[in-house]
Amino acid sequence: MKQTPTPVWAVTPEKLAEATRRLVATAQPRKIILFGSRARGDARADSDVDLLVIEREVKDRVAEIVRLNRVLKGLILPVELVVIGEQMFEEYADTPGTLYFEAKREGEVLYESA
C-alpha cells in the first residue's frame, strides 16, 4: 500500500523543533509556550501554531514579532507569534480570560531557560 507523502505545509514535530531552535538562538527567551488548538490536541490540518515567546524585556512588541517572524521564514510553518516581557506575563498569567492565563494553564512549554 502506498503511503501518502506529508504535505510541505504540514506541521511536523521536526518543524516545530526547528522553529523553537531558531527562536531561542535569536531571542534568548525565558520561555516558549505552545498554546491554542495544537497544545489542546484539537487542531485541524489547517490550524496554525500559536507560540508565546516570553522574553526578559520587550521594548517594542510589534518590531520583535516582525524580527522573529523573519527568522522563521522558509520553514513553511503557519505560526502566530505572541511576544511579551517576563514581568507583564507574570502580571497577567493568573487573570482568567487572558491569552496568558490560557497559555499558562493549557500550554506546552517547548523551551525554558535555566
Language-model regions, residue ranges each:
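Short beta-strand->loop micro-motif that forms the acidic, two-metal-ion catalytic signature
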Residues: 50-54
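Catalytic core of pol beta-like nucleotidyltransferases
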Residues: 1-31, 40-45, 55-114
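Glycine-rich beta-strand-to-loop/alpha-helix junction loops that act as flexible
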Residues: 35-37
